[in-house]
Amino acid sequence: MKAKHIFLTIISVMMLTACMDKEWEAPDMTEPAYGNNSIQQDATKQVTIDQLKTAYANAISGGGFQRITDDQQLLCTVIGNDIGGNIYKQIIVQDSTGAMVVGINGTGLFPFISVGQQILINLKDLCIGGYGQQAQIGDEYNGSIGRMSTKKWEEHMRILPSHDMSQIDTLDFDIAMDKNRYAGHLVRLKDVMIGDADGTTTLAPEYKAGTTLTYNGSTNGYVHHSLNGESMNALVLRTSTYADFASLVIPTEPVTLYGIATRYNSTWQILIRAADDIKVNEK
């Protein structure tokens, strides 16, 4: 009798364990939880960034927007996100033909779409246009190109398995580069002297009355520094006062800069993504 009770107890424990295993079974993590995994990659629908810029050139250059009605996809790689706080409510993507901004009305994007991540964007029903002639994908806002909602972004984007920055070319920046073609690209600037460097001035300090620094937008918006003495109407280093590296002291030595070369009309604006995008040259 005792043996029978022991046998029944063992069976009961085994059944309970099996039920618990079933109840607490780990979720299927083969697909990313962020984005829309139902978007199927279709080579016949894919367009390049250069093709988009060409097809919507008037909307981009004219400061307007146009809604994309064709069933098209963009296969691209993320080259800039909001991890360092200098890129705000947008990411920058690039393919072998060009680069552009994607406006998203949300923050904390970087844990889901890191630099080097390949993504597929369903373009149908999104808008394309230009902000200061910088090509941007997003949504309509007061008759111009603006940011899309995070809900819409997740519906129109799929994260792909590939994560490889080696496929992306880093251009050696030249101030004479064609802005229509190269704006938005990941670039490298060699042997650069950053303006306002005196051993104590930081990249983007909070605004103080009497400052000689150039602030763009609100007093605590962006700080512009010249590069190699070029006119600030032609080329600036643009850093947010809210960037994680805003308090970095500007090197007084020549540096190599890595960043995103965006444009605002005729002005090149270099956006660094993290403190290590500034590398002091070895002597």
State each model region's role.
Residues I6-I11:
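Sec-dependent N-terminal signal peptides
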Residues M20-Y88, I92-K283:
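OB-fold nucleic-acid-binding modules
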Residues M15-A18:
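C-terminal motif of bacterial Sec signal peptides marking the signal peptidase cleavage site
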Residues M1-H5, D21:
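Positively charged n-region of N-terminal signal peptides that target proteins for export
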